[in-house]
């Protein structure tokens, strides 16, 4: 056993405004809450992890508040005093102690990896096998709910060379209205940008079978999670000249294997939180590669810490055919890092410093911490 142990664990909720309302088929977001967790080790290393969700509990069973409670009440007491360098052993222990709670586990695993990378003087990507790329292509989601506003937003992104791939949130309106929305945006951006859509499970199989060919005719190249059922998604496969991507139904390696077994998607949206952490997401990607399923780096609209953790993982992938959507920090009005991330030329630069390679602006975070409360668990 290493002499380096976990000394204490702190959690807090940070409520941050967004640049505009973000409209999905399931809900509309007016801000984002980050659950931040800090792991303090006896050698002085401090790791930071983050948990977020999309629109509170509208997307899934966990919320930032639930993550914080799970860590404070169950995970932190089980980790304090344990060997901080045996990350996979610790995560296996937590997996036996508490079922599911993938988002909370991902936040803790990120913090442990951040601390270990700082301890060893290497980037998290090196702890995951080594990066294959320094920069990642990043798509932007158009989700204002208004066609003209989305077009203006897309044109601005193209002009400043920040994004040239756009994912449109649809599914909340009538099918013909949504398809007209997609077609109009693609008509304006033309060959300057690619257009994809995310339905967030809003359609029935019958609706999807009608809408997907129309989306293909409109110039859409990928449809994300059009239906809620894995079986329905599998039945839709290979019927249309558009790639179909699994997202919400991907809840870790077990789900990934079952979807791959029935050839249930063209593309997997890899998300560290939804998978249960970076190592679990790595296994999801390995299953996809073995099955010939292509990869896309997804987001839970995370802040900087989960975004960068995801970037370190995605940078290590052999295949990343559909790029990423790691734009979460750009949706938030407040910069919580001492040095902003580098988004330029349609890509994100993966930080190369020890650990995650980023530093929290403590004063900024204190201003937005809910009720000024920070929970500390120590021996």
UniProtKB/Swiss-Prot annotation:
Record InterPro entries: Chloromuconate_cycloisomerase, Enolase-like_C_sf, Enolase-like_N, Enolase_C-like, Mandel_Rmase/mucon_lact_enz_CS, Mandelate_racemase_C, Mandelate_racemase_N_dom
Top EC group: isomerase
Cystine residue pairs: none
UniProt pathway annotation: Aromatic compound metabolism; beta-ketoadipate pathway; 5-oxo-4,5-dihydro-2-furylacetate from catechol: step 2/3
Family of this protein: Belongs to the mandelate racemase/muconate lactonizing enzyme family.
SUPFAM superfamilies, sorted: Enolase C-terminal domain-like, Enolase N-terminal domain-like
Lineage summary: Bacteria, Pseudomonadati, Pseudomonadota, Gammaproteobacteria, Moraxellales
Protein name: Muconate cycloisomerase 1-1
Domain of life of the organism encoding this protein: Bacteria
An individual GO BP term: beta-ketoadipate pathway
Catalytic reaction list: (S)-muconolactone = cis,cis-muconate + H(+)
Record-listed Mn(2+) binding positions: 198, 224, 247
GO molecular function: chloromuconate cycloisomerase activity; manganese ion binding; muconate cycloisomerase activity
Pfam family membership, one: MR_MLE_N
Family matches, as CDD domains: MLE
Function: Catalyzes a syn cycloisomerization.
Gene (name only): catB1
Keywords assigned by UniProt, alphabetized: Aromatic hydrocarbons catabolism, Isomerase, Manganese, Metal-binding
Subunit structure comment from the entry: Homooctamer.
Known cofactor(s): Mn(2+)
Catalytic machinery residues: 169
E.C. number(s) listed in UniProt: 5.5.1.1
